[in-house]
Amino acid sequence: VPVKEQMIAWWGPIIHEYYAGTEGNGFTAINSEEWLTHKGSVGKGLTAQVMICGEDGEPLPPRAEGMVYFAGGGEFEYHGDAEKTRDSKNQHGWSTLGDVGWIDEEGYLYLTDRKSFMIISGGVNIYPQEVENLLVTHPKVADVAVVGAPHEEMGEQVVAVVQPAPGHEGDEALAAELIAFARANLSHIKAPRRIDFMAELPRHPTGKLYKRLIRDAYWGKESRIV
């Protein structure tokens, strides 16, 4: 949110944001004026109705966090993967891209994270995006990815992989500083227990982070149920 606030302040209210997938099952959009009164939102549904559902597939009330579904949108199927296609829909026929979020009373959608990236540490569900959104505001951080790594007692531990800002070294001092920063602004269970550094995080030319590559490096051949 602070980054987009700065972008709008610098360029003016010309920034538009949308949420959609190549599946074509739904689309949301929001302009700068709307965003400034609904900070963090990715907009309202334009081509389908946005529904937030619980584990049972039934709709949840406003501000309750759950799986994001599109109702009444385009039909799709994953080529050669009938199981994935089936799992993307609930009993109402609404489809999901696998994201978690919530809607406010006006119907604006706020994304929390992807369900597949959720970290389960000590029985607590932790969404990496919340931790990433905080750490990226630190002046010594250029980029960050938060993943779950194996932990003997907790099941998983929160690990932040940080790309230091130019002029700063990825060393033990910076790691300690970032952990302290996180603990001062998040509950301790959400704060990273470990900070690792990379010269540059793997991103697609479009800017999409290849988080799975980072996460898989910690798990190796160990199995993980998400």
Where are these regions (language model features)?
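AMP-binding/adenylate-forming catalytic domain of the ANL superfamily
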Residues: 184-208, 226
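Beta-strand->loop->alpha-helix junctions that form or flank phosphate-binding loops
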Residues: 16-23, 27, 42-45, 147-150, ...
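AMP-binding/adenylate-forming catalytic core of the ANL superfamily
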Residues: 20, 56-59, 69-72, 76-77, ...
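A short, polar/charged loop-to-alpha-helix boundary motif
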Residues: 218-226
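Short Gly/Pro-enriched turn/cap motifs at secondary-structure boundaries
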Residues: 38-44, 89-92
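Gly/Ser/Thr-rich phosphate-binding loop
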Residues: 1-38, 49-51, 56-59
